[in-house]
Amino acid sequence: PVIFRHYNNVALSQEQNGGFGSISQTTHNHNGHNASTSDGASNAHFYPGQFYDYHWSTTLARADMTNTQATDPRASGPDGNGRLVHVPGDYRELQGTLWFHDHRFFYTAENVYKGHVGMMNYYSGKDRANEALQDGVNLRLPSGTMLDYGNTDFDVNLMFSDAASDPDGQLFFDIFDTEGFLGDMLLVNFAYKPFFEVMPRKYRFRMLGASMSRWYKLALVNQAGKVVPVQVIATDGNLIPRPVTVNQMDTMASGERFDVIIDFKPFKVGDRLYLVNLMEFEDGRGPKDKLSISDALRGKTLDPGVGRVLEFRITRHMASVDMPGYVYDSQRAADQDRSQVPAVLTEQIPIVAPVRERIIEFKRGADDARDATVNGCFPSCPAERETPWGIRINGEDTHSLNANRISMLVPRPGEVEHWTLLNGGGGWDHPAHLHFEEGVTISRTGFAMGAAERGARKDVWWMGEGGSVKIQVRFGEYGGAYVTHCHNTVHEDAAMLLRYDILTDPNNPNTSQTHVQVIPTPNPTPDGVTYVMPEILPEGTPFHRSFRPFPRTST
């Protein structure tokens, strides 16, 4: 477990903060399997001069019902000395590439854009980031050998985002645009048009789409513009059952991640390769078109986000990050690539009959009041902005963000539900993100399932206009308040977010005992916290007589 203490040292004066963003903060561990109090989206924000302790458990999901005696060596973590620490839970729920970012309701996009964001990796017995250790569990994916685990010399995080600047070189953001924000500068790890030196061997790249409203369609090409295939091994931080070799990666929407293996061995020192973005945008509503590689390289678009985004330069020597002072030599025997990419990476979680189904429609417009004087907003809405987005459950009224409203209630851990995520249309795309748990994609409409999506665990699902995605979710041992929302964070801040709660089992000692019933919602202020009992929508709770466990949808 990790305690992450977040101090808020933001300037108290809003004028000192660039004209946008919130001085109150909260941090969400994206894809973390944590208690709701440490999820970062339970309305527990805090103010300048305050701090908040997040307890990131790093436990495996299903610890309350699978491998409870921790006998499966695949459900494990490295001990730092070449051995394993066994833990309860399902090894198929192991996590790898995660990230953290601000999640202050109504201000997420702005705070993340200003820099409240970062990537982090979870290491496990199967994926310990040591390519030499052979213990029958470790996959030996490209990473390095200097450390027992967590080698990063050949295992590299890449965060893709976009930005715009004003005439003074400061970040520009339009707080009144609720469709979506596009920058004219494409950044990789906050650098504009960077290059990266690599040795002629295999690398693992953990890629994150961290833009507010721009997604990416990436391909690797050589100096002649010819495509170089890559292997996809993980999506949304989760190993896929088998590696998939592709010429172009699946679309990476906001919040999505792809781990890919690139083998630079066929190239010689001095060669250069390029990651190219093919996805063209005209505005923040969604992609306009996917360009061919040749058109993207020739600049046949007005979108400055299309084209080369990262250059790889093949080099013989490279300084180690894991062992400062050591310099690799690609011609030295001790520095040869010892990694592998196994044909099987993990086991697919099977699709089973659900206890209930839900239809969750992401759409324009809402039927509820947005006037804070009648409790329409919780926490208080930004008075100067529109909040045109909402979510509808099972075809009932459309509601917009209210942290004190439970739109869906899961009555006990361990239950399996099937959700149909539906784009209500109108010309917008929506990447839907589920907090706390992950789902397995069952089917799609609107466009075909991506090569890396089939059988994989995910936490973000991109829906094109009018499209839908059906997923399977099993809810775990923690309880409390979580959310699901559009990860076009401009849409999210304009109220396209709902709260769902999980109740825990008081008779199971392996589950959290803190949320056996619905508890009050915190309402923080600079001077303290008050608590209010939440509203529960009847269409979202199985305890209500009008609840429909298997609603019908035309999709």
Language model: regions and residue ranges:
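Low-complexity, Pro/Ser/Thr- and charge-rich linker/hinge segments at domain boundaries
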Residues: 125-152, 317-331, 504-521
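Beta-strand cores of secreted/periplasmic/IMS beta-sandwich domains, seen most often
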Residues: 1-35, 42-112, 119-131, 137-152, ...
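Histidine- and aromatic-rich segments of cupredoxin/plastocyanin-like copper-binding domains
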Residues: 31-63, 160-338, 447-449
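General secondary-structure edge motif
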Residues: 81-82, 100, 187, 235, ...
